[in-house]
Amino acid sequence: MPKVKRSRKPPPDGWELVEPTLDELDQKMREAETEPHEGKRKVESLWPIFRLHHQRSRYIFDLFYKRKAISRELYKYCIRGGYADKNLIAKWKKQGYENLCCLRCIQTRDTNFGTNCICRVPKGKLEVGRIIECTHCGCRGCSG
């Protein structure tokens, strides 16, 4: 998360309410980045980072679109400041993508057969009792 440069322009009203949560998530992100990865698969070491990125973006999304607790100015400030992923939030606004875990799961160019990730398959269409985990972010099913 980028440092807030307060010398240029003060943050919008309501920043004091959002800042402690974003600082806490930033601290967790730093811990996840420095966490040792011995004993984990190569892809598993990035999963906590993807989860925290999702959590931070979802927090801003919920405050603005669901609870309407922050102003548009503060929302745009958070997007411009890198506190939330604007592309992920744009997908959450579309039908069928409300619970999307990360953008890598819907990119078809990263797969051999040009398909989406396994976590995008509805649970009703999977085998009963089969536990799935996305190789990109560790999601266990974000399609519903």
UniProtKB/Swiss-Prot annotation:
Broad class of the protein's primary localization: nucleus
Chain span(s) of sequence motif Nuclear localization signal: 2-10
Biological process (GO), any one: mRNA splicing, via spliceosome
Keyword list, A-Z: mRNA processing, mRNA splicing, Nucleus, Spliceosome
Localization: Nucleus
Entries under PROSITE patterns matching the protein: G10_1 (PS00997), G10_2 (PS00998)
Gene Ontology CC terms, in alphabetical order: spliceosomal complex
Similarity field: Belongs to the BUD31 (G10) family.
Subunit structure: Identified in the spliceosome C complex.
Role of this protein: Involved in pre-mRNA splicing process.
UniProt protein name: Protein BUD31 homolog
Gene name in the database record: bud31
